[in-house]
Protein backbone atom coordinates (compact mmCIF):
# COMPACT_ATOMS: atom_id res chain seq x y z
CA UNK A 1 0.00 0.00 0.00
CA UNK A 2 2.91 2.37 0.53
CA UNK A 3 3.45 3.06 -3.13
CA UNK A 4 -0.06 4.48 -3.49
CA UNK A 5 0.47 7.22 -0.94
CA UNK A 6 4.08 8.33 -1.43
CA UNK A 7 2.69 11.28 -3.39
CA UNK A 8 1.61 12.89 -0.12
CA UNK A 9 5.14 13.06 1.22
CA UNK A 10 6.45 14.36 -2.09
CA UNK A 11 3.86 17.12 -2.23
CA UNK A 12 4.59 18.24 1.33
CA UNK A 13 8.33 18.16 0.77
CA UNK A 14 8.04 20.17 -2.44
CA UNK A 15 5.81 22.77 -0.84
CA UNK A 16 8.07 23.17 2.17
CA UNK A 17 11.29 23.28 0.16
CA UNK A 18 9.86 25.98 -2.07
CA UNK A 19 9.39 28.22 0.96
CA UNK A 20 13.12 28.57 1.47
CA UNK A 21 13.20 31.37 -1.09
CA UNK A 22 9.97 32.96 0.09
CA UNK A 23 11.64 36.17 1.22
CA UNK A 24 13.09 36.62 -2.28
CA UNK A 25 9.72 36.37 -4.06
CA UNK A 26 8.29 39.87 -4.63
CA UNK A 27 4.64 39.85 -3.60
CA UNK A 28 3.90 42.63 -6.09
CA UNK A 29 4.32 40.18 -9.00
CA UNK A 30 1.23 38.27 -8.01
CA UNK A 31 0.99 34.58 -7.26
CA UNK A 32 1.22 31.45 -9.38
CA UNK A 33 -0.76 28.27 -8.79
CA UNK A 34 2.46 26.41 -8.00
CA UNK A 35 3.68 28.98 -5.47
CA UNK A 36 5.29 27.84 -2.24
CA UNK A 37 3.11 27.66 0.82
CA UNK A 38 4.95 30.56 2.49
CA UNK A 39 5.60 32.73 -0.56
CA UNK A 40 4.39 36.27 0.26
CA UNK A 41 1.21 37.55 -1.33
CA UNK A 42 -0.20 41.04 -1.61
CA UNK A 43 -3.30 41.58 0.51
CA UNK A 44 -6.24 41.90 -1.86
CA UNK A 45 -9.93 42.58 -1.82
CA UNK A 46 -11.90 39.49 -2.77
CA UNK A 47 -15.34 41.08 -2.65
CA UNK A 48 -17.00 43.68 -0.45
CA UNK A 49 -15.71 43.31 3.10
CA UNK A 50 -13.85 40.06 2.38
CA UNK A 51 -10.07 40.38 1.99
CA UNK A 52 -7.29 37.94 1.14
CA UNK A 53 -4.51 38.15 3.77
CA UNK A 54 -2.80 34.78 3.31
CA UNK A 55 0.29 33.68 1.42
CA UNK A 56 0.55 32.76 -2.24
CA UNK A 57 0.16 29.07 -1.47
CA UNK A 58 -2.22 29.01 1.51
CA UNK A 59 -5.36 31.08 1.99
CA UNK A 60 -6.38 33.28 4.90
CA UNK A 61 -9.30 35.70 4.71
CA UNK A 62 -10.32 38.71 6.77
CA UNK A 63 -14.02 39.57 6.94
CA UNK A 64 -14.36 43.10 8.27
CA UNK A 65 -16.86 45.37 9.97
CA UNK A 66 -16.84 48.54 12.07
CA UNK A 67 -17.61 46.37 15.10
CA UNK A 68 -14.63 44.06 14.59
CA UNK A 69 -13.36 41.42 12.20
CA UNK A 70 -13.30 37.65 11.73
CA UNK A 71 -10.11 35.93 10.54
CA UNK A 72 -10.60 32.79 8.47
CA UNK A 73 -7.70 30.31 8.57
CA UNK A 74 -4.16 30.60 9.89
CA UNK A 75 -1.93 28.97 7.23
CA UNK A 76 1.44 27.45 8.17
CA UNK A 77 3.46 27.93 11.38
CA UNK A 78 5.70 30.34 9.44
CA UNK A 79 2.88 32.45 7.98
CA UNK A 80 1.66 34.28 11.09
CA UNK A 81 3.83 37.40 10.63
CA UNK A 82 2.79 37.65 6.95
CA UNK A 83 -0.89 37.44 7.84
CA UNK A 84 -0.54 40.13 10.50
CA UNK A 85 1.44 42.34 8.13
CA UNK A 86 -1.20 41.93 5.42
CA UNK A 87 -3.96 42.87 7.85
CA UNK A 88 -2.08 46.04 8.78
CA UNK A 89 -1.26 46.83 5.14
CA UNK A 90 -5.00 46.97 4.41
CA UNK A 91 -5.44 49.55 7.18
CA UNK A 92 -6.95 47.18 9.74
CA UNK A 93 -5.66 46.40 13.23
CA UNK A 94 -5.05 42.80 14.33
CA UNK A 95 -6.35 43.85 17.75
CA UNK A 96 -9.76 44.40 16.15
CA UNK A 97 -10.05 40.73 15.13
CA UNK A 98 -12.75 39.39 17.45
CA UNK A 99 -12.93 35.77 16.28
CA UNK A 100 -10.73 33.27 14.44
CA UNK A 101 -12.14 30.33 12.49
CA UNK A 102 -10.35 27.80 10.30
CA UNK A 103 -10.87 25.12 7.67
CA UNK A 104 -9.21 22.04 9.16
CA UNK A 105 -6.72 20.94 11.76
CA UNK A 106 -3.58 20.39 9.67
CA UNK A 107 -0.37 22.38 10.10
CA UNK A 108 -0.71 24.16 6.76
CA UNK A 109 -4.01 25.76 7.80
CA UNK A 110 -3.93 25.78 11.61
CA UNK A 111 -0.19 26.29 11.95
CA UNK A 112 -0.33 29.91 13.13
CA UNK A 113 -3.56 29.73 15.13
CA UNK A 114 -1.78 30.07 18.48
CA UNK A 115 0.38 32.97 17.29
CA UNK A 116 -2.53 34.81 15.72
CA UNK A 117 -4.66 34.26 18.80
CA UNK A 118 -1.93 35.78 20.95
CA UNK A 119 -1.57 38.76 18.60
CA UNK A 120 -5.30 39.46 18.39
CA UNK A 121 -6.66 38.21 21.69
CA UNK A 122 -9.49 36.53 19.77
CA UNK A 123 -10.90 33.09 20.59
CA UNK A 124 -10.60 30.26 18.08
CA UNK A 125 -13.88 28.57 17.13
CA UNK A 126 -13.68 24.85 16.33
CA UNK A 127 -16.02 21.90 15.90
CA UNK A 128 -15.66 19.19 18.53
CA UNK A 129 -13.64 16.70 16.40
CA UNK A 130 -10.81 19.24 15.99
CA UNK A 131 -10.52 20.48 19.56
CA UNK A 132 -8.25 17.80 21.06
CA UNK A 133 -5.91 18.10 18.08
CA UNK A 134 -5.66 21.87 18.56
CA UNK A 135 -5.06 21.51 22.29
CA UNK A 136 -2.35 18.84 21.84
CA UNK A 137 -0.85 20.26 18.69
CA UNK A 138 -1.06 16.82 17.02
CA UNK A 139 -3.91 14.71 15.57
CA UNK A 140 -4.88 11.17 16.52
CA UNK A 141 -5.65 8.07 14.43
CA UNK A 142 -9.05 9.43 13.39
CA UNK A 143 -7.16 11.74 11.00
CA UNK A 144 -6.39 10.06 7.66
CA UNK A 145 -2.92 11.69 7.67
CA UNK A 146 -2.10 10.86 11.30
CA UNK A 147 1.27 9.18 10.66
CA UNK A 148 2.62 12.04 8.53
CA UNK A 149 1.03 14.96 10.38
CA UNK A 150 3.26 17.87 11.35
CA UNK A 151 2.86 19.40 14.83
CA UNK A 152 1.48 22.87 15.50
CA UNK A 153 1.67 25.09 18.57
CA UNK A 154 -1.16 24.15 20.95
CA UNK A 155 -4.11 26.53 20.99
CA UNK A 156 -5.42 27.70 24.36
CA UNK A 157 -8.66 29.65 24.03
CA UNK A 158 -11.05 27.48 22.01
CA UNK A 159 -14.81 27.87 21.76
CA UNK A 160 -16.73 24.71 20.83
CA UNK A 161 -18.78 25.25 17.69
CA UNK A 162 -21.87 23.29 16.68
CA UNK A 163 -21.74 21.54 13.31
CA UNK A 164 -24.01 24.23 11.87
CA UNK A 165 -22.97 26.96 14.29
CA UNK A 166 -22.74 30.66 13.52
CA UNK A 167 -19.85 32.91 14.55
CA UNK A 168 -21.05 36.49 14.89
CA UNK A 169 -19.17 39.76 15.33
CA UNK A 170 -21.35 42.85 15.09
CA UNK A 171 -23.11 42.59 11.72
CA UNK A 172 -20.92 39.69 10.58
CA UNK A 173 -22.29 36.15 10.66
CA UNK A 174 -20.21 33.24 9.37
CA UNK A 175 -22.07 29.93 9.23
CA UNK A 176 -20.23 26.65 9.69
CA UNK A 177 -20.92 23.68 7.44
CA UNK A 178 -19.49 20.51 8.98
CA UNK A 179 -17.16 19.02 6.35
CA UNK A 180 -15.48 15.86 7.69
CA UNK A 181 -13.47 13.87 5.18
CA UNK A 182 -10.07 15.41 4.58
CA UNK A 183 -9.93 15.62 8.39
CA UNK A 184 -12.52 14.82 11.07
CA UNK A 185 -12.88 18.48 12.09
CA UNK A 186 -13.01 20.00 8.62
CA UNK A 187 -15.36 22.97 8.29
CA UNK A 188 -16.68 24.97 5.35
CA UNK A 189 -17.76 28.57 5.97
CA UNK A 190 -20.43 30.69 4.28
CA UNK A 191 -21.39 34.35 4.64
CA UNK A 192 -22.68 37.37 2.73
CA UNK A 193 -20.44 40.15 1.45
CA UNK A 194 -21.84 43.26 -0.22
CA UNK A 195 -20.65 46.05 -2.46
CA UNK A 196 -23.39 48.62 -2.10
CA UNK A 197 -26.65 46.79 -2.68
CA UNK A 198 -24.96 43.95 -4.58
CA UNK A 199 -24.60 41.13 -2.05
CA UNK A 200 -22.97 37.81 -2.82
CA UNK A 201 -22.79 34.49 -1.04
CA UNK A 202 -19.20 33.71 -0.13
CA UNK A 203 -18.11 30.10 0.39
CA UNK A 204 -14.80 29.13 1.93
CA UNK A 205 -14.97 25.41 1.18
CA UNK A 206 -12.68 23.10 3.09
CA UNK A 207 -10.19 20.83 1.35
CA UNK A 208 -12.00 17.77 -0.01
CA UNK A 209 -9.07 15.59 -1.07
CA UNK A 210 -8.96 11.92 -0.04
CA UNK A 211 -5.29 11.89 0.97
CA UNK A 212 -3.91 9.72 3.76
CA UNK A 213 -0.88 8.07 5.24
CA UNK A 214 -0.05 4.47 4.30
CA UNK A 215 -2.30 2.95 6.97
CA UNK A 216 -5.65 4.70 6.69
CA UNK A 217 -8.23 3.20 4.35
CA UNK A 218 -11.41 5.15 3.66
CA UNK A 219 -13.19 1.90 2.84
CA UNK A 220 -12.40 0.33 6.23
CA UNK A 221 -15.64 1.06 8.05
CA UNK A 222 -14.73 -1.30 10.87
CA UNK A 223 -11.67 0.78 11.73
CA UNK A 224 -13.32 4.14 11.00
CA UNK A 225 -17.07 3.73 11.51
CA UNK A 226 -19.16 6.08 9.43
CA UNK A 227 -16.19 8.06 8.11
CA UNK A 228 -16.75 7.32 4.43
CA UNK A 229 -20.47 8.05 4.71
CA UNK A 230 -19.70 11.35 6.42
CA UNK A 231 -17.20 12.23 3.68
CA UNK A 232 -19.79 11.55 0.99
CA UNK A 233 -22.31 13.66 2.89
CA UNK A 234 -19.77 16.50 2.97
CA UNK A 235 -19.45 16.36 -0.80
CA UNK A 236 -23.22 16.51 -1.21
CA UNK A 237 -23.56 19.44 1.20
CA UNK A 238 -20.82 21.49 -0.47
CA UNK A 239 -22.27 20.79 -3.91
CA UNK A 240 -25.67 22.08 -2.77
CA UNK A 241 -24.47 25.33 -1.18
CA UNK A 242 -25.66 28.72 -2.34
CA UNK A 243 -22.33 29.75 -3.82
CA UNK A 244 -21.49 32.92 -5.73
CA UNK A 245 -17.79 33.22 -4.91
CA UNK A 246 -15.69 30.18 -3.96
CA UNK A 247 -12.37 30.36 -2.12
CA UNK A 248 -10.49 27.28 -0.90
CA UNK A 249 -7.71 26.74 1.68
CA UNK A 250 -5.28 26.06 -1.16
CA UNK A 251 -6.08 28.93 -3.55
CA UNK A 252 -5.05 26.93 -6.60
CA UNK A 253 -7.83 24.39 -5.89
CA UNK A 254 -10.42 27.01 -6.82
CA UNK A 255 -8.32 28.89 -9.39
CA UNK A 256 -8.23 31.98 -7.18
CA UNK A 257 -5.17 33.60 -8.77
CA UNK A 258 -6.91 33.55 -12.13
CA UNK A 259 -9.81 35.49 -10.58
CA UNK A 260 -8.17 38.10 -8.31
CA UNK A 261 -4.88 39.97 -8.33
CA UNK A 262 -2.54 41.09 -11.13
CA UNK A 263 -3.05 37.94 -13.24
CA UNK A 264 -6.86 37.84 -13.02
CA UNK A 265 -8.39 36.78 -16.33
CA UNK A 266 -11.52 34.87 -15.31
CA UNK A 267 -14.73 36.06 -13.64
CA UNK A 268 -14.62 36.20 -9.85
CA UNK A 269 -18.17 34.90 -9.55
CA UNK A 270 -19.30 31.46 -10.67
CA UNK A 271 -22.48 29.98 -9.25
CA UNK A 272 -21.42 26.50 -10.42
CA UNK A 273 -18.05 26.57 -8.66
CA UNK A 274 -19.03 24.73 -5.47
CA UNK A 275 -20.83 22.03 -7.40
CA UNK A 276 -17.86 21.50 -9.71
CA UNK A 277 -15.43 21.55 -6.79
CA UNK A 278 -17.40 18.83 -5.00
CA UNK A 279 -17.84 16.81 -8.18
CA UNK A 280 -14.09 16.74 -8.77
CA UNK A 281 -13.53 15.64 -5.18
CA UNK A 282 -16.16 12.90 -5.54
CA UNK A 283 -14.39 11.54 -8.61
CA UNK A 284 -11.06 11.50 -6.77
CA UNK A 285 -12.64 9.75 -3.79
CA UNK A 286 -14.11 7.03 -6.00
CA UNK A 287 -10.72 6.57 -7.65
CA UNK A 288 -9.13 6.22 -4.24
CA UNK A 289 -11.73 3.64 -3.17
CA UNK A 290 -11.06 1.65 -6.33
CA UNK A 291 -7.34 1.68 -5.53
CA UNK A 292 -8.08 0.43 -2.03
CA UNK A 293 -10.27 -2.36 -3.38
CA UNK A 294 -7.53 -3.41 -5.80
CA UNK A 295 -5.02 -3.73 -2.97
CA UNK A 296 -7.28 -5.31 -0.35
CA UNK A 297 -6.32 -8.75 1.02
CA UNK A 298 -9.35 -10.33 -0.67
CA UNK A 299 -8.27 -9.05 -4.09
CA UNK A 300 -5.11 -11.13 -4.07
CA UNK A 301 -3.04 -8.06 -4.87
CA UNK A 302 -0.12 -7.11 -2.68
CA UNK A 303 -0.28 -3.67 -1.01
Regions found by a protein language model. Give the residues of each.
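Bacterial N-terminal signal peptides that target proteins for export
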Residues: 1-9
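Bacterial N-terminal signal peptides
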Residues: 9-18
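Metallo-beta-lactamase
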Residues: 23-32, 39-40, 45-48, 69, 76-78, 96, 156-157, 166-168, ...
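Conserved beta-strand hairpin/beta-sheet module of binuclear metal-dependent hydrolase folds
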Residues: 36-90, 94, 188-210
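Divalent metal-coordination and catalytic microenvironments
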Residues: 49, 63, 73, 83, ...
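Active-site HxH/HxHxD metal-binding segment of metal-dependent hydrolases
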Residues: 50, 78-81, 88-166, 266, ...
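C-terminal regulatory/interaction regions
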Residues: 267-303
Amino acid sequence: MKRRFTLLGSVVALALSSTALASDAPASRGCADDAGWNDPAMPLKVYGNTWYVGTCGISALLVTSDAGHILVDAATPQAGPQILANIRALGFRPEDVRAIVFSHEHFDHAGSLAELQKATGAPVYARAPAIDTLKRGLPDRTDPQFEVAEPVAPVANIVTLADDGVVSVGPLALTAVASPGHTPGGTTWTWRSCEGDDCRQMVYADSLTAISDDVFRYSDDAAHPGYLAAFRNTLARVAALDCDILVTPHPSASGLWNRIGPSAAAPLMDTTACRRYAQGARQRLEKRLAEEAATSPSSGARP
